[in-house]
Amino acid sequence: MLPRVLLAEESLPFRRVIREALTAFRDCEVDDTPNGEHAFELALRRPYSLFLFALPLAEMDGHLLDRLIAKAYPLAHPGVHTAPPVIFLIRAEEAARFHQIQRDARVRGHLPMPPKLDALLTLTEGLLPPKPNGGGFPKFSLAPDVP
């Protein structure tokens, strides 16, 4: 079974970039949602290997979402003793706030927004397996095929 990632971020373009990058370079599946309430429901419904939560979310703060899931996740998934690790998606103005919450052992870092591929792959290295055969985005060429 492939590892599954839960991504909660309000911006559809950012969710799309992160989802496409992870599925291109990591051997995983990604569920994404724009709001914290739906993320909470998904976390209780399915097992996950990693959470990626934006600090500001509609309806619920990303840190609060993580705290609630950390308490409920082991109850919803028998045999699991702790919730998966979390990476927070932060904007520049949230950097000071992130430093206050990074002490939690499950917090594996932060991804500055807008997302950058190298930062995302560095943060997920060791948390998600690499795609077989290196993965990557499809190769396109504008040059005509030469026999």
Q: What is the meaning of each model-derived region?
A:
Residues 32-50:
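Acidic, metal-coordinating helix/loop segments flanking the phosphotransfer/catalytic sites
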Residues 28, 49-50, 105-111:
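Conserved phosphoryl-transfer motifs of two-component systems
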Residues 12-31:
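Two-component/phosphorelay signaling modules centered on CheY-like receiver
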Residues 64, 88-110:
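Alpha4 helix (beta4-alpha4-beta5 surface) of REC/receiver domains from two-component response regulators
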Residues 115-124:
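C-terminal output helix
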Residues 81-82, 129-147:
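CheY-like receiver
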Residues 9:
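Conserved acidic carboxylate
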Residues 52-82, 97:
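Conserved phosphotransfer microenvironments
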